[in-house]
């Protein structure tokens, strides 16, 4: 994509927009000239994100005043674990006349627990939020993108897509599904003007990763954990350059070959040691 300002002529849709990286995606996409569709289950957080974006756009010294008047937002309060979540989101954007040019499937959940110890409710939730709803959102919006000859889809996979480890296995399993269907869809969309990009994040400094402040600071200093701002910047740059994927963080790239080679016996030993400290979900 040319890095030209879009003059608020098209929409970017971001799930998980009420806080964290989702909020940052919305801000950065608005700065690129996109109207924004914000999706989250948290209505209060969506309102806060809307207010923050509106303030930033109106305060911008680089956007002409007459162009600022074109800026629009649509907030959709939606539980992404519901079977009809994608249908509800699509229906509301169609009713509002939103031409979605950028889709960011950002929403996610994370926990550390073995499959047998995880509640059925949580297993269903993580599969719906990471697999079912993002896939169906891709399916619903990609057709119009292809018809227009322009579209960008950013799916959030993970370094964990290569880590079938007990404790984080279900998180990794769902992210592996994201990785693989994104590749298939990218190949299907060749020569159409539509690209699909995967972000393979390792540890990002967000509340999704439960760490004490001292350990969080240590992880940042060791470059094991990156800031959400850096993660979003790398992901969006890769998206608009139509790259297949991006894996921010030098150590992620360094350790990736070793991660996939860890033997089952070592993983089993580590899980047995860690199991007493894992939280029931």
Indicate where each model-derived feature is located:
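Substrate-binding pocket helix/loop in short-chain dehydrogenase/reductase
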Residues: 114-127
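SDR active-site lid
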Residues: 188-251
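Conserved NAD(P)H cofactor-binding loop of Rossmann-fold oxidoreductase domains
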Residues: 106-111
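Residue(s) in the substrate-gating loop at a strand-loop-helix junction
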Residues: 158
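Canonical Rossmann dinucleotide-binding motif of NAD(H)/NADP(H)-dependent dehydrogenases/reductases
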Residues: 2-37
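Active-site helix of classical SDR
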Residues: 138, 174
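Conserved glycine-rich Rossmann-like NAD(P)H-binding loop of the short-chain dehydrogenase/reductase
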Residues: 34-48
């Amino acid at each position: 994509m040319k890095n030209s300002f879009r003059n608020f002529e098209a929409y970017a849709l971001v799930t998980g927009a009420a806080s964290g990286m989702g909020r940052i995606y919305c801000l950065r996409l608005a700065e690129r000239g996109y109207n924004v569709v914000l999706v989250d289950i948290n209505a209060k957080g969506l309102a806060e994100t809307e207010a923050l974006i509106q303030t930033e756009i109106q305060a911008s010294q680089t956007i002409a005043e007459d162009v600022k008047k074109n800026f629009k937002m649509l907030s959709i309060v939606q539980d992404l674990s519901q079977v009809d979540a994608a249908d509800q989101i699509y229906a509301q954007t169609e009713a509002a006349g939103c031409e979605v040019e950028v889709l960011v499937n950002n929403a996610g959940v994370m926990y550390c627990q073995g499959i047998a110890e995880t509640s059925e409710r949580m297993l269903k939730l993580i599969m719906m939020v990471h697999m079912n709803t993002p896939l169906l959102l891709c399916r619903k919006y990609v057709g119009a993108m292809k018809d227009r000859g322009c579209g960008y889809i950013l799916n959030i996979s993970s370094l964990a897509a290569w880590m079938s480890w007990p404790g984080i296995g279900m998180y990794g399993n769902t992210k592996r599904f994201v990785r693989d269907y994104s590749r298939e869809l990218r190949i299907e969309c060749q020569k159409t003007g539509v690209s699909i990009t995967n972000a393979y994040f390792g540890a990002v400094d967000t509340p999704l990763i439960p760490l004490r402040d001292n350990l969080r600071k240590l992880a940042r200093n060791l470059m094991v954990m990156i800031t959400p701002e850096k993660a979003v910047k790398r992901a969006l740059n890769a998206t608009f350059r139509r790259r297949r994927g991006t894996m921010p963080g030098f150590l992620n790239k360094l350790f990736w070959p070793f991660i996939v080679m860890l033997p089952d016996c070592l993983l089993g030993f580590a899980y047995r040691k860690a199991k007493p400290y894992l939280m029931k979900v």
